[in-house]
């Protein structure tokens, strides 16, 4: 069976890709399957740079086609922050509570109409000796004034979706997987899926 590598240790992300490639009889592996690689430091200044860094590094090490994503929250009134620093906005990587607390503090006194934001995702598909391909997806919303909901992770409890009248952490997981920034990026990837599958199966 052919295999594609997803440059993440996040099981949730891996499952999204497993659904896509299962119909092509392509197995999905993640960085959890390659502990010797270790964590890849995200030193880029854009989502695309970070996604490419992860995908190209792993593709080179394993000599296989690799997909990586970099995603984050963009708040307009904060000039795009936290952006590529979303996971470590409060200075501690992946501390959701501290990140949300800092975001709320930085938005104190900002009226609802000016709390517009979006989640962004860039996917990078890297194959050794070939040009890296990129796919992007976004979902628009507003930053709420307090945490609501227990589903999801990260900034989901603060990301209010006017269309649904709920935060991303209040909608069912199935719906989130349909409308999220990552889901929208994957939809773009699916348009070129035949090409990606060819890269994997010809190895």
Swiss-Prot record:
The record describes the protein's role as: Pyrophosphatase that catalyzes the hydrolysis of nucleoside triphosphates to their monophosphate derivatives, with a high preference for the non-canonical purine nucleotides XTP (xanthosine triphosphate), dITP (deoxyinosine triphosphate) and ITP. Seems to function as a house-cleaning enzyme that removes non-canonical purine nucleotides from the nucleotide pool, thus preventing their incorporation into DNA/RNA and avoiding chromosomal lesions.
Q: What Gene3D superfamilies does the database record attribute to this sequence?
A: 3.90.950.10
Q: Which positions in this protein are listed as binding Mg(2+)? A: 41, 70
Mention one GO molecular function: metal ion binding
In its UniProt record, which GO terms are filed under biological process?
Answer: nucleotide metabolic process; purine nucleoside triphosphate catabolic process
Q: Which organism is it from?
A: Listeria innocua serovar 6a (strain ATCC BAA-680 / CLIP 11262)
This chain's protein is named dITP/XTP pyrophosphatase
Enzyme Commission identifier(s):
3.6.1.66
Q: Which residues bind substrate?
A: 8-13, 71, 153-156, 176, 181-182
